[in-house]
Amino acid sequence: MEIPITIGRATLSDLEEIVAIEESCLSSEEIVSYEFLEESIRKIADTFLVARDENQLVGYVLGESQSLHPTWIEIRSFAIHPDHRGQGLGTLLLASLKQVAVEGGYEYLRLTCPDDLLSYFEMNGFV
């Protein structure tokens, strides 16, 4: 029996699991500080989404609106736990963030990524 993945807004109770995923996935240069993540949950929870497999947090995407470009959301951090990659969770999270952006009146999602991830994001509609 397959367990459905649920997508929801990040809460402060998710913070430790988010940090653990970051540390398991990202290099020290890419890791966002605990304080930034906590502040993001408090201030921009609408665009900070988490994926859960039952009670376990398995991935997240953090989007932040830009004051210079109020119709943009910039993806600041995005990670899927290594044990859950290749199952479409990243695509599901990105699609969910796109839906939140449309519902919020945003026109663009923006991100920067290493060259080796370009094809992944292109596959998910980024150009």
Regions found by a protein language model. Name each.
Residues 101-113:
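Conserved GNAT acetyl-CoA-binding A-motif
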Residues 9-13, 20-76, 81, 94-96:
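Acetyl-CoA-dependent GNAT
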Residues 16, 35, 119-122:
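Alpha-helical elements of the RecA-like P-loop NTPase motor core of helicases
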Residues 112, 122, 127:
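Conserved catalytic-core motifs of GNAT/GCN5-like acyltransferases
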Residues 56, 81-92, 104, 116-119, ...:
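Conserved glycine-rich acetyl-CoA-binding loop
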Residues 4-6:
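Extreme N-terminal starter segment of soluble prokaryotic enzymes
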